[in-house]
Amino acid sequence: MKTQTTHAAEQHAAKRRWLNAHEEGYHKAMGNRQVQMIAIGGAIGTGLFLGAGARLQMAGPALALVYLICGIFSFFILRALGELVLHRPSSGSFVSYAREFLGEKAAYVAGWMYFINWAMTGIVDITAVALYMHYWGAFGDVPQWVFALGALTIVGTMNMIGVKWFAEMEFWFALIKVLAIVIFLVVGTIFLGTGQPLEGNATGFHLITDNGGFFPHGLLPALVLIQGVVFAFASIELVGTAAGECKDPQKMVPKAINSVIWRIGLFYVGSVVLLVLLLPWNAYQAGQSPFVTFFSKLGVPYIGSIMNIVVLTAALSSLNSGLYCTGRILRSMSMGGSAPKFMAKMSRQHVPYAGILATLVVYVVGVFLNYLVPSRVFEIVLNFASLGIIASWAFIMVCQMRLRQAIKEGKAADVSFKLPGAPFTSWLTLLFLLSVLVLMAFDYPNGTYTIASLPLIAILLVAGWFGVRRRVAEIHRTAPVTADSTESVVLKEEAAT
């Protein structure tokens, strides 16, 4: 028995060495300051700055509770990811962990679902950029696709010049987002605390009770809204991908993850509560940031425009992060055979440029959608992005559970940074993600049609696997000698099925 355990541990160690070889070529240039701000910025994006307006109309003050619930489960997912990162930092993030603990088929599904997530999220961000630009009347007649193309040019260039520059620019993007929320919280609190009227109307809790209470449309609309709010936290797992290019991920990642939960509480829950105490919840509009709505009503010249520049930066930040993630995820998939061979190529700046260019092509499709149906793009692709997010987060939780099992069996070393309450919190998070899928079905028509498309997505994934399995088998036949013969046989048999 002891011999079998030892052999299993050696076999798993061999697989880890093979996976670590996939990290060659990256430049570990990110410092603590940058990782901290990337983690914060990942939790603050278009979902809050643009999506909150429409969601306040749908759920009213109950949106704060929805953000809190989603924020707690997002923290569980981040802690699970942190556990995996301390086990083995990887730019391939949970796709690489799926390959280690679940096999190549799981890595294939995880990778392509995550790509769907970021591809759709990028289209949402492109749409957001165009909507923000239309806030200024001078640009009202300019088609959305013009602004979308300009945004793609900017972020595409940023991602090609090296990870150090990406991290630095993302640091400043995130800092601007944080400062915007902080300024709103300070100004809004002053108005609320001093009893200063806004547009001649008193602020305070009466704005909730006088406008239908905490659940103005009932409980069901607030519950269904969870599937939309999930999108607001879509970038939190970015810190896992960034860990592969950190100078010291063992110290930086836990610190960054632990700082996220209270910031979610302050920035999301605190902001929504303050918004509904300053203005009636139905004063906020879909298509316009609620923060822009608030500052515009202060009567201070140009304050609305200044805030609009800030939220425009937030959309560009999210788009920038999406390109960063997809480039590295596609390279990880390519190294295992689940994506085309050319996507593994790196530039002299240590950038996986092929994957980034492939993502840019998909984003161009988003620009085309902006041209065809500019008014509906945001909601249409939001639901498809949610599918990718749910799948990605589910893989993180399952991989974390398999890591715990591997540690228990002696196949992997224990880690100091763990998900609190596991495995209960692991199963609870998976149940939450499943409930989000169920709730999406009630969001007619977009959510209902999205859930109805799941069989088609499954068929496409199966067809795609048959297209890549030969290359998967070939890669594992020529795997480096660090993987032992038994491991190679297992991998080759898996690829052949």
UniProtKB/Swiss-Prot annotation:
InterPro entries: AA-permease/SLC12A_dom, Amino_acid_permease_CS
Disulphide bonds in the chain: none
Compartment(s) where it occurs, according to its Swiss-Prot or TrEMBL record: Cell inner membrane
Main location: membrane
Topology of this chain in the membrane: Multi-pass membrane protein
Record keywords: Amino-acid transport, Cell inner membrane, Cell membrane, Membrane, Transmembrane, Transmembrane helix, Transport
Keyword Transmembrane helix: yes
Gene Ontology process terms (BP): amino acid transport; transmembrane transport
GO CC annotation: plasma membrane
One matching Pfam family: AA_permease
Residue spans crossing the bilayer: 34-54, 58-78, 109-129, 146-166, 171-191, 219-239, 264-284, 298-318, 353-373, 378-398, 422-442, 448-468
Entry's family note: Belongs to the amino acid-polyamine-organocation (APC) superfamily. Amino acid transporter (AAT) (TC 2.A.3.1) family.
PANTHER family from the UniProt entry: GABA PERMEASE, L-ASPARAGINE PERMEASE
Protein name as it appears in the record: L-asparagine permease
